[in-house]
């Protein structure tokens, strides 16, 4: 009884202390009202609640008080997990095999030359020989002449005349023979007998052509007898050196004169040249070996003989230098020289990447045979020369060639001449490997096995593979196989020869733009970068997963529930059962969760390691549905309170409660702590990816503007220039073609003085210089007069001079008839008016009474007035000239006049006539 009483007393004391403690807490911390708490924001679990979790006993008032004094979780999701029973077991997946990252494809570096379709025509120089015939018919009337008809035609010059006159003497015949309407016609220049005329250069020529002719004049004869028709003929022999063009398939060519010759420029009498196209009869064509033409300017023969072709058309004769077709014509032309090219094989095709022009070309892995395209003999030589030049400049000291030049036809019609090469270090490694393995393979075939797919494989050395000893049966079998092989080879050769003759060679057509190649380069660049990045990420990810799998496998033994929950991304309770894990799914708590303020248990030396809670599984549960448990990690609620520890001094704990943290000190609740007050440390590894580098697209022209303009068969601008200058070049037009007769005369005088020796030449130079100055002055005046503005100015000056001469003549005549009136018109008019007023209109007959003395004085006055006027003019001229001679002369004249003394008396101030009248 003593023990029972003692235990009962202790229990009573503990309960009393708890009640007192609860009362204190209630006073310190405001309790949450018993109203309906806030509902968590998370979704509700669809699982049913285990009935074993619900309590069966009725809670006592002490527990209700403790629950009411707790802290209600206002936000956050809470879960409760039943213990795993083994009904559901799982296992961790074994390690996976990770993909290996491909570091690259089969790359080959080298030098390349890219060819394109040659759209430019084949150009060459040609000579055109013809005679321009002009027949004019003029009607002569009594007082006029009119042109009634004019006939113009071009006729070819015979090849014999070209041989004997034009290219032999630099002359041409004035006679023309031509066939019209099956009748042979003859024409003679100036209607005279046949003569040989010199070919002189034309004054007017286009930049791309030269011309010579025998005359600049067109004859037009008019007789003396009127009322008749007169006919005259002009024959002008013309030789033109022009540009000729021909395009593929070179079955004709055009001249810059506008004429088209329907024969191939490569047609000839040799075996291969006879197969070329020719639309004319054989007698119209002629080929001369070792021909030496004459330069009509210098009158000298050509230095080297050539093979000359002559063809006669109905209007002209054309000649040109014959050359072999394979040497001159080529259907491909060089576009780009690439000093750095990378070739890689991808999905059965080659990709040629050129970073310098940001382009990628795609072709088959089989080489292109140049024999399959027409006229491609120039490609091999140009490609080899260009590649060798680049190699000598940049790679001779660092790289070696690993194969011959290979040709590949890329998409878009580009032919790539590629020659692979490797560095010197890599070549040494290959050679050391060959020496180590005692092999005799060709280094080029070893480094570039796809260089020649048709060549036989090289046999190994006798030291490496011993040959078996032949037997009789094997010899017989070898002979039979040899015969069968020989027949098969002969049949194949015959088939190939027939196929070659029957197969039509196909011309390579090139696109006018390489935008597709630039887009291919951009796509390949992006694809390579992205694929490499993704491959590395996939490999690294798989490796990391395998390593983490080992960590998961070990950590599941420590905390299986946390590991399995993180793996399944779902709240579960787990327990290790040997090599498997038993799990049960956690249930979301829909009810309220209350956190108690104290973590102390009934034992004074034992405390809870995690806060105790009370909760309800469902909403609106009564007091019977309240469960006592303990707060676990990550808002998990245990249905039991088994997590205890010895009570410690200065204990501090933070626990996650909902979305916030609660702080306990000395196992007593202090306050809530928001997550923002707690610093976060991240366990995530940042993924650092490299961004794509920038690529700029450069505009490239496959064909320049000049090439596109030069693609036509005819140069129409040249034709128009030629046609417009044709009349100016060969006809006598006074307004355009002027013969400089002065130059002819001066040239004759110079020739005369040159014949007199050096002294005569010197004298001639002086004479010609002076004469040239005079002629230039006269010609300048004449040209000024010929100018309309000059003529108008001269006419106005002549009219002004005539008007001035008329007024001067009138003034002189007035001086002679009445000098006083001319000199003093105002004084004379006033005297006349005064006299009329004094004597009236009828007193004019009183003019006989004159004073002789006054008349004499008047004469003296006039004399001295003239002398004064002369002196004033002399002084004025002296002042203008600023010279002292005139001033001295005028002063001397004044002194002389003063010394003469007065020879006249002073006039009277009164008029005696008036005094008489007054009387």
Curated annotation (Swiss-Prot):
Keyword Glycoprotein appears in the UniProt entry: yes
GO biological process, one term: symbiont entry into host cell
Coiled coil (residue ranges): none
Subcellular compartments: Virion membrane; Host cell membrane; Host endosome membrane; Host Golgi apparatus membrane
Residue numbers spanned by region Hydrophobic membrane proximal region: 733-786, 765-785
UniProt motif Internalization motif: location: 904-907
Disulfide bonds: 81-586, 98-542, 172-237, 330-378, 607-647
Record's compositionally biased regions (Basic and acidic residues): 906-919
Region of interest (Involved in fusion and/or binding to host membrane), ranges: 138-144, 223-231
Chain positions carrying an annotated carbohydrate: 106, 216, 321, 364, 438, 456, 493, 496, 499, 666, 688
SUPFAM superfamilies: Viral glycoprotein ectodomain-like (SSF161008)
Ranges in the topological domain labelled Virion surface: 29-788
Topology of the protein relative to the lipid bilayer: Single-pass type I membrane protein
Gene3D superfamilies per the UniProt record, alphabetical: 1.20.5.1890, 2.30.29.100, 2.30.30.1230, 6.10.250.3280
Keyword Membrane: yes
Intravirion side: 810-919
GO CC aspect terms: host cell endosome membrane; host cell Golgi membrane; host cell plasma membrane; membrane; viral envelope; virion membrane
Residues with site note (Cleavage): 460-461
Similarity comment: Belongs to the herpesviridae glycoprotein B family.
Function text: Envelope glycoprotein that forms spikes at the surface of virion envelope. Essential for the initial attachment to heparan sulfate moieties of the host cell surface proteoglycans. Involved in fusion of viral and cellular membranes leading to virus entry into the host cell. Following initial binding to its host receptors, membrane fusion is mediated by the fusion machinery composed at least of gB and the heterodimer gH/gL. May be involved in the fusion between the virion envelope and the outer nuclear membrane during virion egress.
Assembly mode: Homotrimer; disulfide-linked. Binds to heparan sulfate proteoglycans. Interacts with gH/gL heterodimer.
Name of the featured protein: Envelope glycoprotein B
Organism of origin: Equine herpesvirus 4 (strain 1942)
